[in-house]
């Protein structure tokens, strides 16, 4: 049998991954998302590795909004958008996201992975170029692979290399600079002001995946374009509803009106995927309403992140510099990252060791993510646990 060969090869691969400390085990939760969660086996732990930046994953207002919408609009749409899958609430959310992000128009997707996967191929042909930061999210990388445009990469946040790439692609019809707004593994922000200056100088478009920023970065949570004051200079923003904005799933692309209209006509993930579920649409609309009322949650996550980062640096941990809710503790060796995460779980702190291929080889880390749901007591407990395990492992 043909599968016999594949089976033995895969079993050998899994054995190698386990020996190298690269095999990923999924921990099973027994509670809803929150600052404190239950883990199968009866253990409770503080959760410091969720994308739950605003603490809205289990918020009663958000849950009720999802239930109310579902009671009227139903569980699913059973269709794609252009057949019979566009409800009034989908247009409401598109309009609300356009207003929130300061863009002309918005198109919804089942996930931001689909938003990125469906952007480049319809927009850029063989006579165009896409210029990408080397640490961009996998969804950008995969989306770029689907298009026929010339591909250029620049070293992470290196503006000199970006300018070289712009010069090299001067004869291309269109040039699109694409970058994460907040880089998910390092927690630093793209230099959007400098990127926009270069884009203006060389007549290029700018695209930002703001998934790890929308909702809490910027004065009112509008993301990295707001933080850098360049919203009107950004051509395309992709983002998710699966992180700060409630944490379920779904995403969108916002941007120039004509680009969004092209995506409605040609973007394959949009044309051939079911419409976003009504419950997610309703919950996301509620989140946007809540954010328009108050900056309290945004201010809280910033306060928590600043305090945690300061205390961990003071304790002697190797922290990647940054000023977002993502705080990477660098451990470099994959087995060490996995071991430390397991030891912290025994102390009541849920974190994950990130290893290759999620991060480059030799760059293993524990990525701590702060939330508005965390209390000062939660932070102090977790800092104390890190210090204890850090001393036991000889890290501090």
What is each PLM-predicted segment?
Residues 80-86, 94-118:
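Short loop-beta-helix segment that forms the pyridoxal 5′-phosphate
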Residues 60, 64-68, 72, 95, ...:
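PLP-dependent enzyme catalytic core of the Aspartate aminotransferase-like
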Residues 299-308, 313-348, 358, 362-363, ...:
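Conserved PLP-binding catalytic core of the aspartate aminotransferase-like
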Residues 245-312, 317-320:
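PLP-dependent aminotransferase class I/II
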Residues 119-138:
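Conserved PLP-anchoring active-site segment centered on the Schiff-base-forming lysine
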Residues 11-73, 204:
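N-terminal "arm"/small-domain region of PLP-dependent enzymes with the aminotransferase-like
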Residues 52, 152-208:
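Active-site phosphate-binding strand-loop segment of PLP-dependent enzymes
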Residues 220, 226-262:
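Active-site PLP attachment segment
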């Amino acid at each position: 049998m043909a599968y016999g060969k594949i089976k033995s090869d895969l079993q050998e691969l899994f054995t190698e991954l386990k020996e190298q400390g690269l095999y990923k085990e999924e921990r099973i939760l027994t509670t809803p998302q929150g600052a404190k969660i239950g883990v199968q086996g009866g253990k409770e732990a503080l959760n410091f590795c969720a994308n739950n930046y605003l603490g809205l994953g289990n918020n009663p207002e958000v849950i009720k909004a999802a239930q109310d919408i579902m009671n009227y609009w139903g569980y699913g749409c059973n269709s794609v958008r252009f057949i019979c899958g566009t409800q009034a609430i989908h247009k409401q959310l598109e309009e609300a996201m356009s207003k929130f992000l300061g863009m002309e128009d918005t198109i919804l997707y089942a996930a931001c992975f689909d938003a990125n996967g469906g952007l480049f191929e319809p927009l850029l042909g063989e006579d165009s170029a896409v210029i990408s930061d080397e640490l961009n999210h996998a969804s950008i990388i995969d989306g770029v692979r689907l298009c026929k445009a010339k591909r250029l990469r620049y070293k992470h946040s290196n503006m000199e290399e970006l300018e070289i790439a712009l010069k090299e692609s001067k004869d291309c019809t269109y040039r699109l600079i694409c970058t994460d707004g907040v880089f998910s593994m390092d927690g630093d922000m793209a230099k959007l002001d400098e990127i926009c200056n270069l884009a203006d100088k060389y007549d290029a478009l700018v695209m930002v995946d703001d998934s790890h920023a929308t909702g809490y970065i910027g004065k009112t949570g509008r993301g990295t374009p707001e933080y850098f004051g360049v919203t009107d200079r950004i051509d395309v923003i992709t983002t998710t509803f699966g992180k700060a904005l409630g944490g379920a799933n779904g995403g969108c692309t916002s941007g120039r009106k004509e680009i969004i209209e092209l995506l409605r006509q040609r973007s394959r993930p949009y044309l051939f995927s079911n419409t976003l579920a009504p419950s997610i649409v309703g919950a996301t609309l509620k989140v946007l309403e809540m954010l328009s009322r108050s900056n309290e949650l945004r201010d809280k996550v910033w306060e928590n992140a600043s305090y945690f980062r300061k205390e961990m640096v003071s304790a002697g941990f190797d922290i990647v510099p940054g000023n977002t809710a993502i705080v990477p503790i660098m451990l470099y060796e994959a087995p060490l990252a996995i071991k430390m995460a397991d030891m912290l779980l025994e102390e009541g702190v849920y974190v994950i060791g990130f290893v290759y291929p999620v991060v480059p080889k030799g760059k293993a880390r524990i990525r701590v993510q702060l939330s508005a749901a965390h209390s000062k007591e939660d932070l102090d407990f977790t800092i104390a646990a890190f210090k204890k395990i850090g001393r036991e492992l000889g890290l501090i």
